[in-house]
Amino acid sequence: MKVLKSIYKVMGCAILAASLSSCVNDWLDVAPSDGTDAGAALTSSSDLDAARTGMYKALKGNSSLVDYYGQQFFVYGDVHAGDDYQYNYIGGSNRANFYYDMNYQTASEFNTSTVSWQSPYVVIGRANRIIAAAEGGKLSDAVEAKAKIEQYAAESKVLRALAHFDLVRIYGKPYTEDQGASLGVPLVIGVLESNAKPARSTVAEVYTQVVKDLTEAISSNALATETKPGYVSVWGAKAILSRVYLNMGDYANALSVAEDIIKNSGAALWTRDQYFKAWDASTPNESEFLFRLNVAGSDDNNDLNGIGNLQQRDGYKEMVATKKFVDMLTSDPKDVRNDMFLPATASKEVEKYGTNKVFLNKLRGQGGDLRNVTIVPIIRLSEVYLTAAECAFRNNDKTKAVEYLNDLVKNRTTTEAFLATVDNITLERILIERRKELIGEGQRYFDALRNNETITRYTSEADKGWHKTLSKEAQSFNRDYFKAIAAIPQAEINANPNIKQNTGYGE
């Protein structure tokens, strides 16, 4: 597959030729299933509309390209940690074991089946194409379609920011480790010349651009104020911005944005009675979703390789909750999130996991069809409450931290002992609640890195929980271990000598 060459063809130019395989390059080099020629000029708002569809499709992926929110980003964000959600080595089929086993040594092992690289840059390329056309002033209906054009440009800036943000968290050190001084990823914020070979920007430079894109989109007042499934609104943009500030350790700004969402978005936490049914793909409860993808139908589903089928007991069943996580969650039998898991049924898995509920049942698919996972969460209101609680605590406002944490907990359990007080609230307590709430949504690993946690799968062969035997380095590690961040795919290094590889990886 052509990695950045294909990406920049989507932008209207070809650079950084690289070849990994030939499985999906046709999808990138021709019209992106959006009714537009990838190299044709955008001359009207209707052209932008079609290009916008292609941009969102790249975020979701398809059955051949699942290296972003179609599958791989969620696997990376949860299974690379492996302390709450592990590879199911009993019944899995090696689709989610790469970052769990951590046996990789060379950059050539990183490609679209193992890491998010190509698709985020496709999103960026398509976003740049829309922004350039929208802001170029040459669209045939620039006056009469002004509001629509500005909205599409603002959405494109949000998705460009999201893709850069996700990339820099995978390939760069956490911002909180060195205030962004180390290398991040190439910033692509416009159409590049055909001979361009961009170097990696620093983590700080990438974050600066991410914040700039998000704040410009928000302040443009062009984003929709009503949240609609499949598209980003002003509240989705603000939620992403709050997450970005949190990852930067900018707790004051993260709290400010989170509180704006809580007070003014009109979104509401699911109640305990609503929680399980809210994830029903046929009749989803939208009140918590600030930004989710709408994957439905043969045009944009990820077929059996999608994240829903990977998680589900009746699908590829690649991942299971760890014993440590199950013990943590079941310590409160009245917590409704216990209902989000199913027990094993296959004999070998029953032998290993017993009657414990280990298979996550969030992404259930529409009508039982696990290829049509219509609910793919990018960010929910519950995360915003947890961000507000964490940031208030870090800013020494325990009263406010208790308020936001308990607002969530009261909607998940009736056990009063799990409610926090000013006297007993701790950062650990807030982070544990975050783990319970967001499992399977791709955030655990990044939270561990930004907080400089030691990720511990197990430390004793005599007490491994449900883990298989792992290398010593994979049993317990922190962000100092070179494998804590991914290698830049070797094909990119070969094509562009300006891209420096992450330390520790051979070819």
What are these model-predicted stretches?
Residues 1-21:
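Sec-dependent bacterial lipoprotein signal peptides
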Residues 34-42, 66-88, 172-181, 185, ...:
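Short, surface-exposed recognition loops and adjoining beta-strand edges that mediate ligand/DNA contacts
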Residues 45, 50-52, 60-63, 205, ...:
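Extended ligand-binding clefts on enzyme/binding-domain cores
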